[in-house]
Swiss-Prot record:
Site annotation Important for catalytic activity: residues: 271
Gene behind the chain: cypB
Protein name: Bifunctional cytochrome P450/NADPH--P450 reductase 2
Domain Flavodoxin-like: 486-625
GO cellular component: cytosol
Record keywords: Cytoplasm, Electron transport, FAD, Flavoprotein, FMN, Heme, Iron, Metal-binding, Monooxygenase, Multifunctional enzyme, NADP, Oxidoreductase, Transport
Positions of the UniProt region annotated as NADPH--P450 reductase: 476-1053
Positions annotated to bind FMN: 492-497, 539-542, 573-575, 581-583
Length: 1054
């Protein structure tokens, strides 16, 4: 430990201590400025209390250790207890009512619950949209005021089935007026000296009146619900009134219910309204981000009434909100106290009971965690949640005392921002400059804008989800056809995992299983060896759920082989917003079950609440049932009588397309999909691992063929051009040369366009002639004909710009080509090949790829070009299935048969892929006792801090004696560009020595420039060493190729 250091402190002013450093209306901002001056930790003495403030992410990581620190109620929150009592926000962790209420209310904020709130959220969001759409031109909008109305009405309706009807009032609801005044007074009381406070008689009387107004409304809500109970209403209030704590069996008393309602009405709207206000400000001051978010809203929110699933697909808008919370966390601090004497950072002593406050805005701008652009608004930094620095992002607080309503707030904010962007152009007509208003939370002060309606369809609202839930019929259980036992165990605090377990059991009964459910802890020491065991669980702040903790500890203590005979599968519930603990417990259970001898029925499934959870779950369930039925040799599946047969009539599995059948494709299940480039890079390279079926084999150096799908954006462009709907069903009939299409059977047009035809190929001459023949405008027809008649024009205007048939159809509306002709002219969607970057010697049924994601400005000058396959792969989630097949290249790109043969490997960028597999194989061979020949790897990338792929893994391989690595970089500032051929030239003598010893040379990557340059360098090396002519070096290299000692795996083009 370092020598103890005094904690920095600003200048002290006698009995006022450090108080003069605080500006009256800018308490939080004053503390931020002190942090700028004094650094990541400082002491601040108020009259009567001394506090420590931290903002450096390493120090925050320490104070967020719940074994050392717990939530502290500062003076401000203690004053809020006057009306918040021992509600969730203003209670101490040790108070019985916090623990009881926390357990009772958690299920209302599960992912499953969010879907139930969708129509109510949409109801209130629509009122905002309608209000703004009816404004006169140039009429000002007070953003924070309208967002306060919106978020109050939303929590009122979703939580308590109460309508504040704020949009139908000229002034704020009396509850809001009293609440805001009471919050401000509570904060003011916390800053006053004792004598000052005693003199504020009139202010204190108003404070009590405001508390009475809030209590009166809430007590009336409780009384009305008690007088008119409704079993069909499953909201927060019903849970508070009737639900029993699963631990104590007790319900909440009326006084605590009052405190909880007030807590949710305050916390459930103040922070979210501030978030939306700041988000609009950030977008208006960053037009390029506004455009990108608006494009996503247009692309995704295509229905008049947006569905829950569509809101989940607003990924960039969610990134905008996350980045807004990073720069402007609306709850800007949380306070803790030390449970025992401790030391921070190895040098700052903290005594027991010492308050420590985390300044979240400064934490979120810590350049040591976020990089040099920490002050910039860059939503893209949240594209890969796993890259978010651990303990450097805390907008919702920490651990078990983190905001219970996080998912609710983000779901609401995502919906509202998406709808606002879809329907309005936002105008910063005053050139507003940010001024932050402080109370318990922060928000933009006096932020006003104008809006202009966009040409979009009017929004309709139907509260259909609730009606659908009521109308659902209980599935009819079929009599068991085979009676195979199915035990579905769950670990659940929020209720999501338990609900999924119940649904899986119900599905199992319909399929003829004898199914039952139970908490994981109920089966400690008695997992059955007969039948299947399914485990559905979540992580809770990185720890097991309450009813799974004992099971996890029991698993850890088992010896290897003790679970032999148990057949199992795991599905995990999680949220990537908490990157550091995402899927920790499900993955731990899955790995330990396997390690202790159990047989895995299928790869783990992972549902991400920050993404399309239902899609992840459905994909895993389909795979689980298929592989479980196969494992137990069950052929008959009972019909699910509550599902219309029509819903499965038109399903088209990826491996059932004509192209897939032609290639013998099978389903690979995604086990991992992670970013390899750093957050500082603007590009993307993904490491993707697939589990392939038993019996499918591959070798190092093989290719994996992927049958991709066209993006939703591309497909939507086709639908829009031809006036089609995504749910239109068609039947294709035609001649034999169209055998790549699904003939003579119904198929949804969106499935056809997604999986069967190429939409991004440059238009062929034949296609252009056909387009011209269907064009009724003579000048436009002539333009199209000219593109075909002149080879130079065709190459320059079509091929060089990669203009597609769809591009021309959009450019020439007078072209009346029918959809069936368009479809007939499109080529079959071709497989894309990737070098396998793994070795079967490590995992026989796991294949990995290293995929460079193609996203760049289109050569046509029209927006962004996105590679079909790389973007399809990049967006796959764990548990998703991809149609794929294995191919061995004819070039002989395989490891030498003799491990002692030297190897020279050249693979810049993603060309490193096969060599990663080679190195894995060499590691296994070495462990088995083989003597390895020397191996050189030449790798190049742009910058060591951006795209040095697999750096740590390769460094370890080099330390283990498996390979010698030579690296070069082409984009390092103030340094000459370095490419692999330059390294080869430097190593001429070494290379020739190895080649004379029989070395095999492998080149993988770009075939247009890199590979020819490498070949030229090898020939020059031979000429220099042997004093040979160009002709002789050419013969020498050709001979190496003929002997399969010089092999290439290269590609050209975009």
């Amino acid at each position: 430990m370092k020598q103890a250091s005094a904690i920095p402190q600003p200048k002290t002013y006698g009995p006022l201590k450090n108080l003069p450093h605080l500006e009256k209306e800018q308490l939080s901002q004053s503390l931020w400025r002190i942090a700028d001056e004094l650094g990541p930790i400082f002491r601040f003495d108020f009259p009567g209390v001394s506090s420590v403030f931290v903002s450096g992410h390493n120090l925050v990581a320490e104070v967020c250790d719940e074994k050392r620190f717990d939530k502290n109620l500062g003076k401000g929150l203690q004053k809020v207890r006057e009306f918040g009592g021992d509600g969730l926000f203003t209670s101490w962790t040790h108070e019985p009512n916090w623990q009881k209420a926390h357990r009772i209310l958690l299920p209302s904020f599960s992912q499953k619950a969010m879907k139930g709130y969708h129509s109510m959220m949409l109801d209130i969001a629509t009122q905002l949209i309608q209000k703004w759409s009816r404004l006169n031109p140039n009429e000002e909008i007070d953003v924070a005021d309208d967002m306060t109305r919106l978020t109050l009405d939303t929590i009122g309706l979703c939580g308590f089935n109460y309508r504040f009807n704020s949009f139908y009032r000229d002034s704020q609801h009396p509850f809001i007026t009293s609440m805001l005044r009471a919050l401000k007074e509570a904060m003011n009381q916390s800053k006053r000296l004792g004598l000052q406070d005693k003199m504020m008689v009139k202010t204190k009387l108003q404070f009590q009146k405001d508390i009475e107004v809030m209590n009166s409304l809430v007590d009336r809500m409780i009384a009305e619900r008690k007088a008119n109970p409704d079993e069909n209403i499953k909201d927060l209030l019903s849970l508070m009134l009737y639900a029993k704590d699963p631990v104590t069996g007790e319900t909440l008393d009326d006084e605590n219910i009052r405190y909880q309602i007030i807590t949710f009405l305050i916390a459930g709207h103040e922070t979210t309204s501030g978030l939306l206000s700041f988000a609009i400000y950030c977008l208006l001051t960053h037009p390029e981000k506004l455009k990108k978010a608006q494009e996503e809203a247009d692309r995704v929110l295509t229905d008049d009434t947006p569905e829950y699933k569509q809101i989940q697909q607003l990924k960039y808008i969610r990134m905008v909100l996350n980045e807004t919370l990073r720069l402007y966390p609306t709850a800007p601090a949380f306070s803790l106290y030390a449970k025992e004497d401790t030391v921070l950072g190895g040098e700052y002593p903290i005594s027991k009971g010492q308050p420590v406050t985390v300044l979240i805005p400064k934490l979120h701008r810590d350049q040591n965690a976020w990089g040099p652009d920490a002050e910039d608004f860059r939503p893209e930094r949240f594209e890969d949640p796993s890259s978010i620095p651990h303990h450097a992002y805390k907008p919702f607080g920490n651990g078990q005392r983190a905001c219970i309503g996080m998912q609710f707030a983000l779901q609401e904010a995502t919906m509202v921002l998406g709808l606002v962007l879809k329907h309005f152009e936002l105008i910063n007509h005053t050139g507003y400059e940010l001024k932050i208003k402080e109370a318990l939370t922060i928000k933009p002060d006096d932020f006003k804008i104008t809006v202009k309606p966009r040409k979009t369809a009017a929004i309709n609202v139907q509260r259909k989800e609730q009606a659908d839930i009521k109308a659902e019929t209980k599935p009819k259980e079929t009599k068991p056809k085979h009676g195979t036992p199915l035990l579905v165990l769950f670990g659940s605090n929020l209720g999501t995992a338990e609900g999924i377990a119940g649904e899986l059991a119900a599905q199992g009964r319909q399929m003829g299983f004898t199914a039952e459910t139970a908490p994981l802890d109920d089966y400690i020491g008695k997992l059955p060896e007969e039948g299947a065991v399914v485990i559905v669980t979540a992580s809770y702040n990185g720890a097991p759920p309450d009813n799974a903790a004992g099971f996890v500890e029991w698993l850890k203590e088992l010896e290897e082989g003790q679970l032999k005979g148990v057949s199992y599968a795991v599905f995990g519930c999680g949220n990537r917003s908490w990157a550091s603990t995402y899927q920790r417990i499900p993955r731990l259970i899955d790995d330990m079950m396997k390690a202790k001898g159990a047989s895995r029925l299928t790869a783990i499934g992972e549902g991400d609440a920050a993404d399309d959870f239902e899609s992840h779950r459905e994909s895993w369930e389909n795979r689980f049932w298929k592989e479980t039925m196969d494992a137990f040799d069950i052929n008959e599946i009972a019909q699910k009588e509550d599902r219309p047969s029509l819903s499965i009539t038109f399903l088209s599995e990826a491996t059932e397309t004509p192209v897939a059948k032609a290639y013998g494709a099978f389903e690979g299940i995604v086990l991992e999909n992670r970013e390899l480039q750093t957050a500082a890079s603007t590009r993307s390279t993904r490491h993707i691992e697939l589990e392939i079926p038993a019996g499918k084999t591959y070798k190092e150096g093989d290719h994996i063929g992927i049958l991709p799908k066209n993006s939703r954006e591309l497909v939507q462009r086709v639908l829009s051009r031809f006036g089609l709907q995504s749910n239109h069903v068609i039947k294709v009939s035609g001649s034999a040369h169209m055998a790549h299409l699904p003939m003579d059977r119904p198929i949804k047009v969106v499935d056809l366009l997604s999986s069967y035809v190429e939409l991004q190929e440059p238009a062929s001459r034949l296609q252009l002639r056909e387009l011209a023949s269907y064009t009724v405008c003579p000048p436009h027809q002539k333009e199209l004909e000219q593109l075909v008649s002149d080879d130079g024009i065709y190459k320059e205007q079509v091929l060089a710009k990669r203009l597609t048939m769809l591009d021309f159809l959009e450019d020439y509306p007078a072209c009346e080509m029918p959809f069936e002709r368009f479809l007939a002219l499109l080529p079959s969607l071709k497989p894309r090949y990737y070098s396998i970057s793994s070795s079967p010697k490590v995992h026989a049924n796991i294949v990995s790829m290293t995929v460079g994601v193609v996203k760049a400005s289109a050569w046509s000058g029209r927006g962004e070009y996105r590679g079909v396959a790389s973007n399809y792969l990049a967006e796959l989630n764990t548990g998703d299935a991809a149609a794929c097949f294995i191919r061995t290249p004819q070039s002989g790109f395989q490891m030498p048969n003799d491990p002692e043969t030297p190897m020279i490997m050249v693979g810049p960028g993603t060309g490193i892929a096969p060599f990663r597999g080679f190195i894995q194989a060499r590691s296994v061979l070495k462990k088995e006792g083989s003597t390895l020949g020397e191996a050189l790897l030449y790798f190049g990338c742009r910058r060591p801090d951006h795209d040095d792929l697999y750096r740590e893994e390769l460094d370890q391989a080099e330390q283990d004696g498996l390979v010698t690595i030579r690296r070069c970089y082409s984009r390092v500032e103030n340094e000459p560009k370095g490419y692999v051929q330059h390294l080869l030239k430097q190593d001429t003598q070494k290379l020739m020595t190895l080649i004379e010893k029989g070395a095999h040379i492998y080149v993988c990557g770009d075939g247009s420039q890199m590979a020819p340059d490498v070949e030229r360098t090898l020939r020059l090396a031979y000429e220099a060493e042997k004093a040979a002519s160009q002709e002789e070096s050419a013969v020498w290299l050709q001979k190496l190729q003929d002997q399969r000692r010089y092999v290439k795996d290269v590609w050209t083009g975009m």
